[in-house]
Amino acid sequence: MERPEEGKQSPPPQPWGRLLRLGAEEGEPYVLLRKREWTIGRRRGCDLSFPSNKLVSGDHCRIAVDEKSGQVTLEDTSTSGTVINKLKVVKKQTCPLQTGDVIYLVYRKNEPEHRSGGGGISPKGSGPSVASDEVSSFATALPDRKTASFSSLEPQDQEDLEPMKKKMRGDGDLDLNGQLLVAQPRRNAQTVHEDVRAAAGKPDKMEETLTCIICQDLLHDCVSLQPCMHTFCAACYSGWMERSSLCPTCRCPVERICKNHILNNLVEAYLIQHPDKSRSEEDVQSMDARNKITQDMLQPKVRRSFSDEEGSSEDLLELSDVDSESSDISQPYVVCRQCPEYRRQAAQPPPCPAPEGEPGVPQALVDAPSTSVSLTTVQDYVCPLQGSHALCTCCFQPMPDRRAEREQNPRVAPQQCAVCLQPFCHLYWGCTRTGCFGCLAPFCELNLGDKCLDGVLNNNSYESDILKNYLATRGLTWKNMLTESLVALQRGVFLLSDYRVTGDTILCYCCGLRSFRELTYQYRQNIPASELPVAVTSRPDCYWGRNCRTQVKAHHAMKFNHICEQTRFKN
C-alpha cells in the first residue's frame, strides 16, 4: 500500500536574493539565488557558468548566505581575482556583500569594454527568472535584515559602473559586444547542489597543476620554456611570444622552447578520468590554428663561428635530430699545457731551451705554480695528437687523461678521487685555482684548512665549540686530532661508513672533509667526561641524539647533549 506522502516533492526553497546584470533594462530576466551556496566560474558544473570566457577561472568565486544571521559573503577562488566595488578581493578570503554592491569577475581598469561579470546587489522581487549561464554583468539581491522587506536596486555611482551592452538573441543565447555566448539549460537543483558541494569540499590539486596560467584551462599541446621550465599551451604562448621574448610567469629571457611530453601525457590521463573537463572540438581546432610554434623552433641551435671572409658570427646553424657524417661540426679541440699545439694556440714566442736534465719541458709548465709532491713523470710527458683530456673539477683546466695508464704505471700521479672518482689536477701538476688548499691528496696529508672545525659535529655549533675549546686547552690542532683518529681507524677502534678509506687513500677535499667529520664525531665521543666542563656533562641526552634536526638551533643545542645515539622512534 502506497503511503500518501510518497510521490510528493518538497517545494523549492524561497529565494534569498537575485543577480542582476549591470545596467539591466526594466523587465530583463535575472537569476534567483535559492541555495545556501552559489558558485560562479567557467566550469560547466558551476551554478552560473561562463564556459566560453577564458578570462574567468574554472571556479571563480562562491556566494554564500548564513541562514541564521542572513549575512551574505563572497569568497574568491580564482587565479585572476574578483573585484567588488572596484576593490580586489584577496584570494581564499571572504568579503561581506551588501545590497547595491558591484561584482566584476573580469575587471580591466583601462578597457571597460572587456569587463565581465560586473553587477550590483539588488533585493529579490517578482519577475521572470533566467537560467542563462552566460551574462556580462550581474547584480545580487539580498533581503533587508532589519525590516525583512525588500527595496529596489539603487546603484551608488552610475558613472563608475560603465555597463556593458547586451543583446538578446532569439534562441535564448546572449551576445556580449558581438561575442557569441551559449546558454546552458537549467539543471536539476539537487544535481547542481551535489556538484557544488563536491567541488567546494576539496579543491582539485591536479587540475590546478595542469592549468595554463594564460587561458586558465587545462594545458593543450603544452610546451616548456628554458631555462625556467614554466609550461603553457602552445597556442597561448604563440600569441605571447609575438609581443615579448620573456617568460609570462617569471619574466626570464627564453632561450629555448621544447615539448613537455610528460605533462601532455598527464593531461591526457586526467581527461580520461574527467571527460567533462575536456575542451570542445571548436576550441581544440582554434588552438591548433593559433599554434605558431613550428618544429624548427624546437630544435637545439648551436652558434657557428665564421671567419671575416665567410660571414658574420651571428649566423646560427640548426642541427637536425640525425647527425650527418658529412657535417663539419665537431667537438671542440681541447689543448692542455702539455700538448704540442699549446704554444701555437697561446700565440707565444718559441720556448727557450730547457734546462739540462729536463728535456722537453714546456716553459709554461715550469713557470706555473705547483704544490704537487713530485713532477718527475709529469715533466717527461707530451700529449699525443688529439689525445684524451680530463677537466679538473676544482679549476676546470684540462690535463692529460692518464688514469688508465696509472693502473699499469704507479709512477703516474693520481688524477682522481678514490671515492667520488672525479678528476683533480693537484697531484698531477698542482692546481692553480685561487684559494685551493690542495684539492687532491692522501687522506693523512689533506689540507682541510683552519675552518674545518666550524660546525664539524653535525653542523652543531655549540658541540663543535666544545671540541675546539678542548683541543685549544691541550695545545692540539685539527691535524693532531686527524693523526690520532687515523691511528684509531687503523686499529679498528674508529669506523668509517666507507670501509675502503684509510690514511693513504687518495681523496678530494669534499670526500676528505666528510670522512674527517665522521672521525671527529668518534673522537669527541671518546673524550672522558672528567676532561669536559660540568656544564657540558650535566646536560641530558636528546631523544634524537646525533640525528636530531633541531640541534642546529643554539638554545636546543645548549640544553641537550647530542653526542649520543637516537633512543626514540628508532627502527
UniProtKB/Swiss-Prot annotation:
Q: Which PANTHER family match?
A: E3 UBIQUITIN-PROTEIN LIGASE CHFR, UBIQUITIN LIGASE PROTEIN CHFR
> What does the record say about PTM?
Poly-ADP-ribosylated. In addition to binding non covalently poly(ADP-ribose) via its PBZ-type zinc finger, the protein is also covalently poly-ADP-ribosylated by PARP1.
Q: Which SUPFAM superfamilies match?
A: RING/U-box, SMAD/FHA domain
The cellular location(s) given in this protein's UniProt record come to:
Nucleus, PML body
GO terms for MF: nucleotide binding; ubiquitin-protein transferase activity; zinc ion binding
- Outline the residue ranges of the record's PBZ-type zinc fingers: 540-562
Q: Which gene encodes it?
A: CHFR
- Give an example GO cellular component term for this record: nucleus
**GO biological process terms on file:** cell division; mitotic G2/M transition checkpoint; protein ubiquitination; ubiquitin-dependent protein catabolic process
Q: For the modification Phosphothreonine, which residues carry it? A: T294
Catalytic reaction(s) noted: S-ubiquitinyl-[E2 ubiquitin-conjugating enzyme]-L-cysteine + [acceptor protein]-L-lysine = [E2 ubiquitin-conjugating enzyme]-L-cysteine + N(6)-ubiquitinyl-[acceptor protein]-L-lysine
Q: Which keywords belong to this entry?
A: ADP-ribosylation, Cell cycle, Cell division, Metal-binding, Mitosis, Nucleus, Phosphoprotein, Transferase, Ubl conjugation, Ubl conjugation pathway, Zinc, Zinc-finger
Q: What is the lineage of its organism?
A: Eukaryota, Metazoa, Chordata, Craniata, Vertebrata
Gene3D superfamilies, A to Z: 2.60.200.20, 3.30.40.140, Zinc/RING finger domain, C3HC4 (zinc finger) (3.30.40.10)
The RING-type zinc finger ranges are 212-251
What InterPro entries is this protein classified in? Answer: CHFR_Znf-CRD, E3_ubiquitin-ligase_CHFR, FHA_dom, SMAD_FHA_dom_sf, Znf_RING, Znf_RING/FYVE/PHD, Znf_RING_CS
Q: In which pathway does it act?
A: Protein modification; protein ubiquitination
Give the Enzyme Commission number.
2.3.2.27
Q: What name goes with this protein?
A: E3 ubiquitin-protein ligase CHFR
Q: Which organism is it from?
A: Pongo abelii (Sumatran orangutan)
What's noted about domains in the record? The PBZ-type zinc finger (also named CYR) mediates non-covalent poly(ADP-ribose)-binding. Poly(ADP-ribose)-binding is dependent on the presence of zinc and is required for its function in antephase checkpoint.
